[in-house]
């Protein structure tokens, strides 16, 4: 059996770690660095370059160099190189293959298994695609683990057995996550998680690029975004300036021969960016981290004062403005400085690989699903089977029925989100369960089961209990959630809570009214000979009144019509009861000749008959 490693597959950089003698070790790559740029390039001679070598030649090979592919994982994105289309999984696999090779060179043996980390807010298709990238790279992916959870695992195990509440603030190159966890006695339990899949260090870099482009255009009248090589040089300069501003008050950006003017004279770019100006042009990006932070604290049901430790993860957390914001949000608590933000996630992944391979004992990792999952039921209602922040793996079942008589099939539509109305949430996928035996509505029993595995991947099964037929879907259709959609779901759920509640109540009134009409008519049909024509006419008139009210939007009119039908139904029930009682008394007189013993028996029979008709004799 080969070795197992932990891999942090990052947007900007990736890291691989392994357990040596039970202790995690970060493996340096062939170039001697402990982090490997997540950059892949296709040289014109056919060679595929990965890591620093790919990054070094990016300026002269712009169209054939791919970076930050993690932002496209799980989508239909692809890039054409030499008439061949490469998916995000294939590009990511190239980075994983280099990490695998470098680990094998260090260990002197094969690496076969890996735990790969993903942002906590990655949805199903992104997790599936990450797993596929690992498989393409020749790795058996033991587990997909959330990055903040892996970081907490690495941090928490060093702190001994004492119970503690840890906040992980993870701002990487392309994604942002914040998680609140409880750690103690070998158990790492995620209480809540939130994030933004479209916020990371790349966005800070882009703001510097935009600033430089604007400065150059105002000075020279030339738009550098039209020049691919110039733009690549700007990106690299922006990243260096951002890093420099973490330790200096200003950064000089000097790019000679950036382009030429109309007369072919070379032009230079020379600007100085102060830390204050950098923070000004990126303040809205920083502000976007506040909402997920507040959401996590709210969902976990803890106060900021109860947080024991704050762990910063991701190279972008080195920016002073980020550190200061985290300190402000946590009531002045200093973030932990003893953790390497670039390496801690890979270390946690290696520990989890050790747990799964039995090399690390007495450690239990309990992660959560970030958004609620459910199906659409009658009236467009979102019926949640699994609530957000539920510990995974988990499995939940609920039994539903048909809405129409002799309904041959049901359409199962799977949604993810927090709104009460299904269509306001994200449709993940749908499938049909057919072959339902003909039966009145309400009779078939359809059991719907949601199963989320330890990788956070969703499987949904629908089974007809009567026939045993079932159908299953694994949500992997690439219908990913953008962060805008996730933010909208959370905000809409709060802003429209009253509206959603009202719509749900209205639908329940309508559903109950329809059901009452159906059940009443069925009852009349079954007891037709016991009810007078006059009473049957009154009941039918009341039933039609409900149907007429249901055509409109007046909820009070529906309730009034239902009340009238209930009154007439009670009169009908009373008449049926009296008819049954009279029939029983006649039978008793004819067969018992007044014997007291027989009268007791007959009374019991009458009570049974009454009970069968839904009435209590007592």
Curated annotation (Swiss-Prot):
InterPro entries assigned: ATPase_NBD, Chaperone_DnaK, Heat_shock_70_CS, HSP70_C_sf, HSP70_peptide-bd_sf, Hsp_70_fam
The keyword Disulfide bond appears for this protein: no
Gene Ontology terms, MF aspect: ATP binding; ATP-dependent protein folding chaperone; unfolded protein binding
Induction remarks: By stress conditions e.g. heat shock.
Residues with the Phosphothreonine modification: 175
Keyword tags: ATP-binding, Chaperone, Nucleotide-binding, Phosphoprotein, Stress response
Pfam families reported in the protein's UniProt record: HSP70
Record-linked PROSITE patterns: HSP70_1, HSP70_2, HSP70_3
Record function comment: Acts as a chaperone.
PANTHER family associated with the record: HEAT SHOCK PROTEIN 70KDA
Family: Belongs to the heat shock protein 70 family.
Name under which the protein is recorded: Chaperone protein DnaK
Protein's organism: Corynebacterium glutamicum (strain ATCC 13032 / DSM 20300 / JCM 1318 / BCRC 11384 / CCUG 27702 / LMG 3730 / NBRC 12168 / NCIMB 10025 / NRRL B-2784 / 534)
Lineage start: Bacteria, Bacillati, Actinomycetota, Actinomycetes, Mycobacteriales
Gene name for this UniProt entry: dnaK
